[in-house]
Amino acid sequence: MLKLFPTLFIPLSALLLASCSSNPPKSSYNNICSVFDHDSDWEDAALDAEKKWGTPAYILMAFVHQESRFKHDAQPEREYALGLVPLPRRSSAYGYTQAQDPAWYDYQKSTGNWSARRTNIEDSMDFIGWYNYQSFKRNGISRYDTYNLYLAYHEGQGGYSRKTYLRKPWLKKVAYKVTKQSIRYKEQLKRCNQAYSSSSPSKSNGKCRAAWPYC
C-alpha cells in the first residue's frame, strides 16, 4: 500500500488544485474584465449565479472585491496576547465571501449543496446570489440595489429589518464604496463586451461576458 500512495496522491492533488482557481493579481482587482481574463472561472461562476438568483454579475463581483479582495482563504486577522499567545479570531468569516459558519450552514441546508466550500469560486458566487435572493424575498430589496443588498449582507436579514445599520455610519460608507465598485464593474463590462464581440469569430465563439441587456 505504501508503494501505491505516491501514484494515488498525485492525481488527487491535481484534482484538488484544479478545483480552486488562482487569485487574480492585485493590479487587476479594480477591472472586472482583467479578472475574467485572468481566470474564466470567475466569469462563468458570476454569470451562472446571475442567471440562477437574479443579482447582476457586476454586483456579485463587487461583493467579493470588498469582502476578500479575491483571496480564497481570507479571514479576520488573529490578535495575540502579549504579542505571543494567539487569541481566537473575531469571527468565523472565511473565504471569498467572508460568510460566517451559521450563514454558510443555512446556505448549504437551503440549497442541499453540503459539499460547498467558501474557498471555491462557483460555490462562493452561488452563496452571494442566494443570500441576495433572501434579501429580496424577506426584506423586499431589489436585486439591483447594491447599497441595501450589502447592508443586509453585513447585518443579516434580521439586523437589516431592525435597521441596525443606522447606528453604524462606517458601514454605510462601506456600502457606498461597494456600490461605486459595482457601477465601475458595470461600465467595464459594457466596454469589454464590445471589445469581445468585435474580436474574430474564432476567438469569441459568440460568447458574451454579461447577461442581457449588456450584450
Which residue ranges define each predicted feature?
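Bacterial N-terminal signal peptides that target proteins for export
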Residues: 1-8
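C-terminal motif of bacterial Sec signal peptides marking the signal peptidase cleavage site
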Residues: 16-19
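Catalytic glycan-binding domains that act on GlcNAc-containing polysaccharides
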Residues: 21-196
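Low-complexity, Gly/Ser/Thr/Pro-rich intrinsically disordered linker/tail segments
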Residues: 195-215
